[in-house]
Design a protein with these regions (language model features):
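Conserved helix/coil segment N-terminal to the catalytic DExD/H
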Residues: 83-122
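Walker A/P-loop
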Residues: 18-38
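Conserved pre-motif I regulatory segment
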Residues: 1-24
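Conserved P-loop NTPase motor "coupling/switch" region that bridges the ATPase
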Residues: 45-46, 81-85, 89-92, 122, ...
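Conserved Walker A/P-loop ATP-binding site and its immediately adjacent core
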Residues: 34, 43-65, 160-164, 326-329
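Conserved helicase/translocase motor-coupling segment
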Residues: 226-340
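Conserved helix-turn-beta segment of the N-terminal RecA-like "Helicase ATP-binding" lobe
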Residues: 55-81, 172-176, 342
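Conserved RecA-like P-loop NTPase helicase motor core
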Residues: 105, 132, 331, 344-411
């Protein structure tokens, strides 16, 4: 039997009697338990839980431990083809009273067209902010489903941008057109950009009314302060370093060749024994997007000053460390530095989930890719985070801090 904290019970009490709800609780306040308990209260025979790929195993463990064991639910991993077939067979057994729950990731959902045949079920979205782009395939698919009940969970439902709430409003049953939503709550102006006119957001209006309307449709907003929880004070220690000189050349000329072995500008070196041509990487910033991408890489991935600072930070402590990174090549270079110090390494990325060292070694270094782990996961065995490079998204930055600064943290 789950015992909820007072603020978690308060969130459930505020949505009592509602079958379409959104729990926008600050990161680290335990949305997982609130959402799953609401699903238990709604008591649908069929439940579909959609989350990030990296959170599949965490959600399955949570549901098995608390609902399969205590309430005899059947839990299915819908990323497994065989279990997906079993789930759909169980759905068809309408005379079977056993509660079933399928767990699937966002990227796979729209590839399982048969899910559109589901009806009378509870739909739960973990990190519902991931459907904020209503034109994306996954968002279109999820918005086309026909659930009886909806549970949305997010610590940053808008990423600071209210215009991205519209798709979640639709799931909550607020029947407002996108045009009217923008007219009532978004301030815009038309600006010229590279010869084209586009609508630029300049601010927001009627925000209190927007939050009131969302509350009427089952949304609960709660910060850590609202929950009455005191967490240890966060201390940010900026480590400043100059960008590599190659960055400035690239920014001026929009093109540069990097030697990936030396992290300096590439110079062809060919003789009888061979050539270094395979170490060349040409960066061409011929569009605004590629220019920005390669500029970021030259400040982080290809900046030797960063690796020197990283080495010094790791050498300065024997505590567990969490390291957030953007690019796989960054992680591989840092992993080599850490292993040379004979410290255990864990990795959480889109391809790898190996947390053994994190769980069992107090001096471990855990590398987490922003997209894979910033928006979910409890890493509060550690109390220090190193940001090797920053993400483009404010939302990922905010959420990443809550991997250690969360309920139960005491240092």
């Amino acid at each position: 039997m789950i015992t909820l904290f007072q603020h978690q019970q308060q969130a459930l009490d505020e949505t009592e009697g509602k079958n379409r709800v959104a729990y926008y609780l600050d990161m680290g306040l335990g949305k997982t338990f609130v959402g799953s308990e609401k699903a238990l209260i709604l008591n649908s025979r069929v439940n579909l839980l959609i989350c990030q790929c990296s959170k599949i195993s965490d959600w399955i463990d949570h549901m098995v431990e608390n609902y399969a064991m205590n309430h005899c639910w059947m839990i299915y991993d819908l990323t497994n083809k065989k279990e997906f077939e079993w789930f759909m067979r169980a759905v068809a057994e309408t005379d079977n009273p056993t509660r079933i729950c399928g767990v699937i990731n966002y990227e796979l959902t729209f590839r399982r067209k048969i899910l559109k045949t589901l009806s009378g079920f509870t739909l739960m979205l973990d990190e519902s902010s991931l459907i904020q782009n209503e034109t994306a395939k996954r968002s279109k698919f999820i918005l086309s489903l026909n659930p009886d009940n909806v549970i949305l969970l997010s610590g940053t439902p808008t990423g600071g941008k209210y215009e991205k709430l519209w798709s979640q409003c639709k799931l909550l049953g607020w029947d407002i057109s996108k045009e009217l939503f923008w007219k009532q709550y978004i301030e815009t102006e038309w600006v010229e950009d590279d010869g084209f006119w586009r609508q630029k957001i300049t601010g927001y209006k009627n925000v209190d009314r927007l939050k009131k309307k969302l509350a009427e449709h089952g949304a609960v907003f709660m910060t850590t302060a609202d929950a009455g929880i005191d967490l240890p004070e966060k201390t940010m220690i900026p480590v400043r370093m100059p960008p590599a000189k190659e960055y400035w050349k690239f920014w001026r000329e929009r093109v540069i060749s990097i030697n990936t072995a030396t992290l300096q500008e590439f110079e062809l070196d060919s003789d009888f024994w061979g050539s270094n041509a395979d170490a060349e990487r040409e960066l061409i910033g011929d569009t605004s997007l590629t220019r920005r991408l390669y500029a970021r890489q030259l400040c982080g991935l290809y900046n030797p000053n960063r690796y020197k600072a990283f080495r010094e930070l790791v050498e300065s402590t024997e505590d567990r460390l969490i390291v957030f990174y953007n690019f796989t090549e960054e992680m591989e270079r840092m992993k080599g530095i850490v292993k040379a110090m004979n410290r255990p390494v864990s990795i959480l990325s889109g391809e790898v989930k190996d947390l053994g060292a994190y769980n069992f070694h107090s001096n471990s270094v855990t590398f987490i890719q922003y997209q894979a782990g910033a928006m979910g996961g409890n890493f509060q065995k550690a109390n220090k985070i190193i940001y090797f490079s920053l993400p483009e998204s404010w939302e990922l930055w905010e959420q990443s801090q809550k991997r250690i600064h969360r309920l139960g943290q005491d240092r």
